[in-house]
Amino acid sequence: HIIVVSALENRYFSGISLGAMQKNRIHLIHSAFDIIYLILGPIFAAVGIALFYTPAKITSGGASGVANILYNLFGFDLGLMTFCVNLPLIAVGVFVFGLKYSIKTFIGSTLLSLWVSFFGKLTGYTGFLDISEPVNILLSAIFGGVLLGTGIGITMKSGCNTGGTDIIAQTIAHYTPIAVGSVSFCFNCLVVGASGYFIGFQPMLFSIIGMFCSSFMGNYVLTGI
């Protein structure tokens, strides 16, 4: 009887040990994928902004859109402006959502800013397409939006985001019954509308196309992959 009980105890505790090991392995795999997503997401988003949007004077919504307007008006470094616009928004996130959330957001927004500066300086913000052709501006809006939305979606799958006005949208949604998507959409419309005044009406129209493409791809990546 003692031998049987001992064998059962060994099997029980070994089962607990294997279960704990399996949970640790799953946790490590998830953490590895989070890191991969956090690295790849800002790269996709930066390519969309620096190589497609900016050469065609197309503006995304959020902080990167504000940075793009400042870049077109004053010639400030686009990546640096993106980082500077994000900083006070991240500070708001510290008080509302805590330090852990804000650190992740800071990492995502910093990586985005660095990659935007890298690709911008690498190509001089000229991109791959000849923007003197109207069809290429349309292609820039479509492909830039697809890349930007993919990057944002991938980054959010890691539990982070790239900062921007989404922090304000989440803050408003936190204290009111208004949905995050609705607030974010309103902010994006304000930024894109401002680009029509400061940059031009035609780029604003292409920016609207890009905004819908990026929104679609962001939702698809989060729910479909």
Question: What is each stretch, according to the model?
Answer:
Residues 5, 10-225:
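Core subunits and conserved enzymes of cellular information-processing
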